[in-house]
Amino acid sequence: MNIAVVGLSHKTAPVEVREKLSIPEAKLEEVLAHLKSYPHIQEVAILSTCNRLEIYAVVTETEQGIIEISQFLSEKGHIPLHHLRRHLFILLHQDAVRHLMRVAAGLESLVLGEGQILAQVKNTHKLAQKYGGIGRLLDRLFKQAMTAGKRVRSETSIGTGAVSISSAAVELAQMKVIDICVCRVTIIGAGKMSRLLVQHLLSKGVSKIAIVNRSLRRAQELAGLFPEAQLQLHPLEEMINAVSVSDIVFTSTGATEPILNRSNLESIIAVNQSLMLVDISVPRNVDADVQQLEQIQSYNVDDLKAVVAANQESRRRLAQEAEGLLEEEVESFELWWRSLDTVPTISCLRDKVETIREQELEKALSRLGTEFAEKHQEVIEALTRGIVNKILHEPMVQLRAQQDIEARKRCLQSLQMLFDLDIEEQYT
């Protein structure tokens, strides 16, 4: 049995590949059930963000489990396996454990140290629990990774002043225009990324901001967070009209297909008009064919790398501090995992000793007579249980703490032989 992660990220695949494999939350239950139906996949969790798609799995046979996950991704994205493989990374056991902790700490993010990824890891764990994807191993791994992410943020300065995808998008737009303060800006979408866009635009002095969203109520909730700003709100039906009077448009929706394309833009863009589109969604909200229109400058999440680079160098030094903390968390998980091979023996020994305790207690109580037994049974029960627990406690602690695998195996074999234990192997 092994822990594996198969995935791709902004480091290994362009956005046009990542968007094909993006898994919306509404489809997650179905996808988790599908993956768990494979014969070699025992537990599974899926981390799907704009910059990565990673499938964490406990596999009963490593090679076959990897093949099953890779084949699933190929079929889901309609990408031939030989083409997809060049974009995939595959990590096993300790490398997979370390990778998730680095992800949770923001060390694998496009924006080094960004905080949003920890919330996304938490959500991955919550949904995998809700839909029955994870069991004992991945549950513990994700909890350890969340602890690692929190420690890195509280014990180092890596999260201080970190740029986000949204702030990088605003920086990019500011770099491309003469004066962003006078620009008319439209944001399509009203989620967390859009909230951050509004926040950063206001900090740059932008005052003409419109929000377009399918749910006007969500747009109103967003506007309520910025009472000092006079945000214009539009339903999705008015999207094209709002875009037509804008200088810059940011898109950040959960749409699975492009909502802006050459067809719906070319008729509304004047010959002398200039329009900038900044798409921070995956799958993309803006079709690549808009680049055929001369008046339009179009950017997506992959274009943010240059903006982020200037912020990265100072943060890399802080990341080195985080590495030591992460190794402590990796080691903690490894110790716990290695101790699992003691569980069947310890459980079996406890069951056997408990059976003996109950049998001997019953004999003793029958000899003491009914009146005495009824009056003192609870005391005698607690006494015998306490004796058993104290006798077993120290050997069990030492057995779990034994880090030498061969020495621990010899101890387990000795216990099994001396107490004639019939062990059903688990978690090997």
Swiss-Prot record:
InterPro entries according to UniProt: 4pyrrol_synth_GluRdtase, 4pyrrol_synth_GluRdtase_dimer, 4pyrrol_synth_GluRdtase_N, GluRdtase_CS, GluRdtase_dimer_dom_sf, GluRdtase_N_sf, NAD(P)-bd_dom_sf, Shikm_DH/Glu-tRNA_Rdtase
Keywords: Chlorophyll biosynthesis, NADP, Oxidoreductase, Porphyrin biosynthesis
Signal peptide range in chain numbering: none
Residues at the active site: 50 (nucleophile)
Enzyme class: oxidoreductase
Residues bound to NADP(+): 189-194
Name by which UniProt lists this protein: Glutamyl-tRNA reductase
Catalysed reaction, written as an equation: (S)-4-amino-5-oxopentanoate + tRNA(Glu) + NADP(+) = L-glutamyl-tRNA(Glu) + NADPH + H(+)
Gene name as annotated: hemA
Function: Catalyzes the NADPH-dependent reduction of glutamyl-tRNA(Glu) to glutamate 1-semialdehyde (GSA).
